[in-house]
């Protein structure tokens, strides 16, 4: 995979301002009504998520996606700080900067010193039926979109090198068959709190699609079991994976999140 042309994902924890007595419903009302007007940098999109289940249930996460590494570093440097071009972007958009200031009265914004990790893409299922586009959209005369994003942190087994694990994934990614409307990504931390650590990111077209296959923590429906039975090579690939590293799902640390807001200027990455 050509790293120079693959997306970059940056994940930032977002916390409610409890000292001001902010309730989550007030924050979510703001981000849906007004926060969506905060633009993304050119070639970027942002999505605000709320934990549905797992480790960070009812907690928030901001996901930035840039179309490639050059587009990411144009605005954020290797230390997670804004570049001169990023500062200029906000100076030229005082209305957007004012919305960010209003956001900060409810919760932290996705910026230092919040916990974050910038991830590169090791591999993805390029044959997924999930179309490119925003993870959240709620606008008149357009189809509503509210995707689910699962983040599953992984760990290598003793004696397994990163090079060996990544080679296995890239050599075998063609064997991965996702559920309809799901898309698998393997990420590797490049900076921030989870440097050099791996995560599986699953983007799912809707909450209904998640529940059609896995309505609860590690619960599989009949539809999911039929899919597995029909795609045995994928299951064999996952068994081989488990000899090298932990796999997505319990007992690993993971959270399924629901998209609750996102930038409405949809010049999103391809």
Task: List each language-model region with its residue ranges.
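Surface-exposed beta-loop interaction hotspot
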Residues: 108-153, 266-269
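Short beta-strand/turn micro-motifs at beta-sheet edges
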Residues: 1-4, 48-51, 135-142, 186-190
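Short hydrophobic/aromatic beta-strand micro-patches
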Residues: 15-17, 63-65, 155, 201-203
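Residues on conserved beta-strands of the protein kinase catalytic domain
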Residues: 58-60, 196-198
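Short, charged interaction patches at domain edges and termini
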Residues: 254-270
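Active-site-flanking beta-strand signature of metal-NTP-handling nucleotidyl enzymes
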Residues: 7-17, 147-155
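Short, surface-exposed ligand-recognition loops at beta-strand->loop->(often short) alpha-helix junctions
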Residues: 17-29, 155-166
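An amphipathic, aromatic/His-enriched active-site/gating alpha helix that lines ligand/cofactor pockets
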Residues: 36-47, 55-56, 65-118, 167, ...
């Amino acid at each position: 995979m050509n790293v120079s042309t693959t997306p970059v994902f940056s994940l930032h924890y977002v916390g409610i301002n409890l000292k001001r007595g902010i309730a989550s419903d007030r924050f979510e009302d703001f981000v849906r009504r007004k926060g969506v007007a905060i633009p993304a940098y050119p070639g970027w999109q942002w999505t605000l998520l709320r934990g549905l289940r797992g480790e960070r249930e009812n907690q928030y996460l901001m996901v930035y996606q840039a179309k490639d590494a050059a587009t990411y570093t144009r605005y954020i440097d290797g230390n997670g700080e804004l570049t001169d071009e990023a500062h200029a972007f906000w100076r030229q958009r005082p209305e957007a900067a004012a919305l960010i200031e209003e956001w900060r009265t409810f919760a932290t914004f996705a910026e230092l010193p919040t916990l974050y990790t910038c991830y590169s893409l090791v591999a993805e299922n390029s044959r997924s039926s999930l179309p490119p586009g925003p993870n959240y959209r709620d606008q008149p005369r357009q189809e509503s979109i509210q995707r689910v994003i699962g983040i599953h942190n992984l760990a290598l087994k003793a004696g397994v090198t990163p090079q060996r694990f990544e080679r296995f994934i890239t050599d075998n990614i063609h064997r991965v068959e996702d559920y309809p409307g799901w898309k698998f990504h393997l990420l590797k931390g490049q900076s921030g709190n989870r440097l050099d650590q791996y995560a599986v990111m699953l983007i799912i077209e809707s909450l209904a699609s998640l529940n059609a296959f896995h309505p609860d923590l590690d619960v599989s429906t009949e539809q999911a079991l039929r899919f597995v039975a029909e795609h045995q090579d994928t299951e064999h690939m996952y068994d081989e994976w488990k000899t090298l590293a932990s796999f997505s799902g319990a007992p690993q640390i993971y959270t399924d999140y629901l998209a609750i807001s996102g930038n409405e200027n949809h010049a999103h990455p391809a």
